[in-house]
A protein has these predicted regions:
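N-terminal secretory signal peptides
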Residues: 1-27, 41
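Surface-exposed flexible segments
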Residues: 43-44, 96, 223-225
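Short, charge-rich amphipathic segments
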Residues: 31-34, 54-64, 135-137, 160
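Solvent-exposed helix/loop surface patches that form functional interfaces
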Residues: 48, 106, 110-224
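Small/flexible residues
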Residues: 17, 23, 27, 31-32, ...
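N-terminal twin-arginine translocation
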Residues: 22-48
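N-terminal mature ectodomain segment of secretory-pathway/periplasmic proteins
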Residues: 49-51, 55-129, 205
Length: 225
């Protein structure tokens, strides 16, 4: 990671936002759970109107991750904001910002847009549904994906069995998923085949945490804010 002055260990997750590296598919918390609830199109499960996490590395908070939901009839819009700043001796050594919006109509993706700024280098993505397909254009190229394709966003574990694409570059992903039950009815989903990441979910499906390996091998955690 380029940085002014001393180069610190890479502090960002190996994928933005969070997502996963390139590669179809295989198969406090109190504040999160007390937020207003929305019904998800295509189902009856409710979800908080907003999710907030602290991004923690080596015991220090280095950023925030926020997902805000808006519902209009059968259309659900999710807006993700990730901001990470790492300073060394008072100097900003690493800066990362990701803005990602996805629009769903029932259980199908209608559109998605992404803008990622990593130390001043900007990449963008656009995806849109067409009859029988999802067309994705990003820094990795243009892709014609199945109609049920979805960006890899960890706030909804139900999409993990779909064809997935990277929410920054647009690259189709090839991940292997395992699910483990947690005490109290929750679950833990682990992804492999491109990165080591895992997400935790409450019994009602609410996303409650995330863990991944950063580019320097350190562990990055998401804790409810």
């Amino acid at each position: 990671m380029p940085a002014p002055g001393p180069t610190p260990p890479a502090a960002a997750p190996s994928r933005a936002g969070p997502g996963a590296r390139s590669g179809g598919r295989q198969v406090g918390r109190r504040a999160v759970l007390s937020a207003p609830l929305l019904l998800i199109p295509g189902g009856t499960r409710a979800r908080p109107a907003e999710l907030r996490f602290r991004v923690v590395r080596n015991g220090s908070v280095i950023g925030t991750h926020r997902v805000a939901f808006a519902e209009a009839g059968e259309v659900l819009t999710a807006r993700t904001e990730v901001d990470i700043t790492v300073k060394v001796l008072g100097i900003t050594a690493f800066r990362y910002a990701h803005r990602f919006e996805e629009v769903w109509a029932r259980d199908r993706l209608r559109s998605a847009t992404s803008r990622r700024d990593r130390n001043g280098t900007v990449t963008e993505l656009r995806a849109r549904a067409q009859e029988g397909a999802v067309l994705v254009e990003g820094s990795a190229g243009r892709f014609h994906l199945p109609a049920e394709a979805a960006p890899l966003s960890w706030w909804d574990s139900r999409r993990f069995t779909r064809p997935l694409f990277d929410n920054d570059t647009g690259t189709p992903l090839q991940l292997r998923w395992t699910r483990r039950a947690l005490p109290g009815g929750g679950s833990l989903w682990q992804a492999s085949g491109g990165e080591e990441s895992e997400g935790t979910y409450a019994a009602d499906g609410t996303w409650t945490g995330w863990k991944t390996r950063a580019e320097d091998g350190s562990t990055v955690l998401y804790e409810p804010a």
